[in-house]
Design a protein with these regions (language model features):
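Glycine-centered structural positions embedded in regular secondary structure
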Residues: 23-24, 157, 399
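General structural feature for long, well-ordered alpha-helical segments within catalytic domains
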Residues: 42, 80, 118, 146, ...
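Catalytic-core regions of glycoside hydrolase
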Residues: 28-29, 67, 118, 124-128, ...
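Hydrophobic alpha-helical scaffolding
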Residues: 74, 108, 144, 206, ...
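Short, Φ-rich (hydrophobic/aromatic) sequence segments
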Residues: 1-2, 276-287, 398-406
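C-terminal functional modules
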Residues: 291-412
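Feature activates predominantly on carbohydrate-active enzymes
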Residues: 1-111, 118, 124-128
C-alpha cells in the first residue's frame, strides 16, 4: 500500500522446473495388471503431482511379453489403450508402451520387423513413446550385441523416421549392480559402446530392490556411457504379497540430480494404496535437494485420505515394512512405538512391570483397534478401502489382541 492508500503491485517471475526430465511410474510388477479404470485414475493423479511419464509394462500382459508380443492387440483392448493415451495426453503424461520380446526372440529380420510392426500398431493408437525390456530372461535373448543391434535398428528405422516420437527406452538384462558382470568389456560396457547415445538405459540400483545412491549411479553411468534411467522398485510388493508398503519413500540420494536421466517408481498391484509411495517419488524427482521423505509422506496421507488423515497415517505407519524377504530389503515400521515396545519387553524379561510403557501401549493398541472403523466410516475412496480391507481387518485384530496381552501381563 502506498502513502496515498493505493495498492501497488510489483511484477515478478516465479520459475519452477523439475530436476529430472522423466518422472513417473512403470507398471512393471508381476501379478494381476491394473484395470482400465485403475490406469485412468492413476494418469489423473500423475497430472496433479507433476509426473509426466507412465511406462506400460505389466509382466502378465501376453501382448506386451511372450507368447503374443508379435501379435496385435484384440480390438477391445486396443480401444482401451487408445483411450488411456488420450487420458494421458489430457494430463500432460507421456504414455510409454513397452515390449518384452527377450524370452523367445529370434535374432533375425523377421522378428526385427515384428517389433517394428507392433510399434507401428501402437503408434496408430496414439502412442509416441516406446520401450524395449530385456529384464528377467535367460538364454539367447540376453546377448548384448544382439540387443544393441535390435535397439539401434528400431532407433534408425522407426524412432528417427517418426518426427514426433520420444527417445527409445530400454531395460537391460543386467539391470542392477549385484547381477552385473564386473569385468571390463562385458554386458554393460558392450551396451555403452554399441547403443545409439540417445537410447535411455534403465537401472534399479545396486540390487533389484534397494536404495538409489549417487555412488551406484556413477558406477553404472561410466559403463553405459550415459546417465541411467532409474527404475526404483518401490512400493512394489510382488515379492511379499501379504504386505503393504505404505511408508515414506526414502533411501533416495538427494545429490544424484546430475546422474540420472529419468526416475520412475514401480508400484504395487494395488494402485490406490501405491499412491502413498508414488507421491514421495514424484516430490523427490521434482526437487532432489529439498526432498524430505517424512514431510512428503505426511502430505501424501493428507491428500490421499483427507477425510481421515490421522487414522490413515496410523495405518500406513504400521504397514511399511516388507518383513523377511529374499531381497533383504527392509523398511522402517511403527517408528514411534517400536522403542516403547522394546523397553516394555526388556522390563518384563527382567521381572519388572513397566507401568509407564504399559499405559502408552494401551493407548496405542486402542488406537490401532479403532483405526479401521474410522477409515471405513470417513473415507470416500471405495477403491482404496477395497484394496486394503484384508489388512484393515487384521489391523483391528492386532489392536484387540494387543490390549488383551497387556491385561494378561499386568495380571501376571
Amino acid at each position: 500500500k502506498t502513502n496515498d492508500g493505493k495498492i501497488k503491485l510489483y511484477p515478478c517471475m516465479i520459475t519452477d522446473y523439475p530436476d529430472v526430465a522423466y518422472r513417473g511410474t512403470v507398471e512393471g510388477f508381476y501379478g494381476t495388471p491394473w484395470s482400465f479404470d485403475d490406469r485412468i485414475e492413476q494418469l489423473r493423479f500423475y497430472g496433479k503431482i507433476k509426473m509426466n511419464t507412465y511406462i506400460y509394462g505389466p509382466k502378465d500382459d501376453p501382448y506386451h511379453s511372450s507368447p503374443s508380443w508379435r501379435e496385435p492387440y484384440p480390438a477391445a483392448e486396443a480401444k482401451q489403450i487408445e483411450a488411456l493415451v488420450a487420458e494421458a495426453n489430457r494430463n500432460k503424461v507421456d504414455f510409454v508402451w513397452a515390449i518384452h520380446p527377450g524370452k523367445d526372440i529370434q535374432w533375425n529380420k523377421n522378428d526385427s520387423i515384428a517389433v517394428l510392426n507392433k510399434f507401428e500398431m501402437m503408434y496408430g493408437l496414439g502412442i509416441r513413446s516406446f520401450a524395449v525390456f530385456f529384464d528377467d530372461i535367460s538364454g539367447e535373448g540376453t546377448q548384448p550385441e544382439k540387443q544393441a543391434g535390435l535397439l539401434n535398428y528400431i532407433h534408425n528405422e522407426f524412432i528417427k523416421i517418426k518426427k514426433d516420437v520420444n527417445p527409445l527406452i530400454m531395460c537391460p538384462t543386467e539391470y542392477n549392480k549385484s547381477w552385473s558382470n564386473p569385468k571390463p568389456n562385458t554386458y554393460l560396457d558392450i551396451l555403452g559402446e554399441k547403443l545409439d547415445p540417445s537410447i535411455l538405459v534403465m537401472w534399479t540400483g545396486d540390487r533389484v530392490v534397494g536404495d538409489i545412491t549417487l555412488e551406484g549411479l556413477n558406477w553404472v553411468n561410466t559403463r553405459i556411457k550415459r546417465n541411467a534411467f532409474v527404475w526404483w522398485n518401490f512400493p512394489v510388493s510382488d515379492y511379499v504379497r501379504d504386505h503393504l508398503l505404505m511408508g515414506p519413500s526414502y533411501g533416495l540420494d538427494i545429490h544424484a540430480k546430475d546422474a540420472m536421466s529419468g526416475f520412475v517408481s514401480n508400484p504395487m498391484d494395488k494402485p490406490e494404496a501405491s499412491k502413498v509411495g508414488i507421491f514421495g517419488a514424484a516430490m523427490y524427482a521434482w526437487n532432489l535437494s529439498e526432498y524430505d521423505s517424512n514431510k512428503e509422506w505426511i502430505a501424501a496421507c493428507n491428500i490421499i485420505m483427507p477425510e481421515a488423515p490421522e487414522a490413515f497415517k496410523v495405518f500406513c505407519d504400521h504397514n511399511s515394512d516388507p518383513g523377511i524377504n529374499g531381497h533383504r530389503y527392509r523398511r522402517d515400521e511403527s517408528v514411534e512405538s517400536k522403542p516403547v515396545v522394546e523397553k516394555y519387553l526388556k522390563e518384563l524379561s527382567e521381572d519388572n512391570f513397566p507401568q509407564k510403557e504399559s499405559e502408552v501401549l494401551a493407548c496405542l493398541f486402542k488406537q490401532i483397534a479403532e483405526t479401521p472403523a474410522t477409515i471405513r466410516a470417513k473415507s470416500t475412496n471405495e477403491s482404496l478401502i477395497k484394496e486394503i480391507d484384508p489388512w484393515l481387518i487384521q489391523f483391528e485384530h492386532l489392536g484387540l489382541a494387543g490390549s488383551v496381552s497387556l491385561k494378561m501381563a499386568s495380571a501376571w
